[in-house]
């Protein structure tokens, strides 16, 4: 049996983190379609006088955003970073220069893991906004959901986030090992 090394774990991790990020983006679309169906049912309830019209309208907007999220993440990225780029976790693989030690592979794996967590955070943020449209939702739910969405966008763009923080607090620091 082969001995599993840390480098092997990072190699396998890079493919996994990319696949999970792509899966969550597809999951956004599926859940968005389901939530749109629920919003349509709530329009019927509003027409019958069982609930107000504001709830299904907000739910329709949230569902539409979730269906369009594969195009929405790059728009948020462009807004935050002044740089329009297609959301593609696999693009990180070519940005970081590789060497024989495998250290850069480890950085790539960690950055892809952070991107995956960011994608999940955005997904969770939208579900929290959806939950806030229901009666009895917690008072801090909207703030928490926006924190998840903004933090998720920063995590999806982790290289640019690191670059911005480094330029702000440590001007002149060399970030070439991150592909920046």
Predicted regions and their residues:
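Short membrane-interface loop/juxtamembrane segments of multi-pass integral membrane proteins
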Residues: 90-103
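Hydrophobic alpha-helical segments involved in membrane association or supramolecular assembly
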Residues: 3-83, 100-180
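Extended repeat-based interaction scaffolds and adjacent low-complexity, acidic/S/T/P-biased segments
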Residues: 86-87
